Amino acid sequence: MKLIVFGATGQVGVQVVKQALWRGHAVKAYGRNVHQLADTDPKLQLIKGALFDEGDVYDAIKGCDAVISVIGGAFDGADKSRSLGMKNIVTQMKKAAVRRIVALGGMGILNFDEHTLLIDQKDYPQEYLPVGNEHRKAFEYLQASSLDW
């Protein structure tokens, strides 16, 4: 299977790339700082690009069987990488006719019960609301899509 990993140079992304390669998948690692990754595996392709660049993201996704998003960012809510990055990924996946995505989200978007998310609970930690809301927005882009997630 040919995979692309967004957020490939983060703590989680590095492990996702390693595991995917170990399992025999061809992997495209996408990010601003992909030079940090060791390019010793012939099944690994490093793609330097910006998450918000529509053309770069489209070109990277094209020809893949699935997308993995482990995008990170700051916790203050000012960094919109999670939400706007997911919006661009979803848009470019549709254009490239790639339907399968696995995306990492934060604890706030886990269900408290059938109709309520943890982030909507009164006792949800206030310091995590900004990043939690970023995860929620990213999740909403996935929910609104016709992708297989």
Annotate each PLM feature.
Residues 3-25:
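N-terminal Rossmann NAD(P)H-binding glycine-rich loop of SDR-like oxidoreductase domains
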Residues 6, 30, 70-71, 101-106:
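SDR active-site strand-loop-helix element
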Residues 30-35, 50-51:
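N-terminal Rossmann-fold cofactor-binding loop
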Residues 35-43:
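Short loop/helix-cap segments at secondary-structure boundaries that form the rim of catalytic
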Residues 42-65:
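Conserved Rossmann-fold cofactor-binding substructure of NAD(P)-dependent oxidoreductases
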Residues 74-101, 130-137:
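NAD(P)-cofactor binding segment of oxidoreductase domains
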Residues 76, 108-113:
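Conserved catalytic-site region of short-chain dehydrogenase/reductase
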Residues 140-149:
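Conserved beta-loop-beta element that borders a ligand/cofactor-binding pocket
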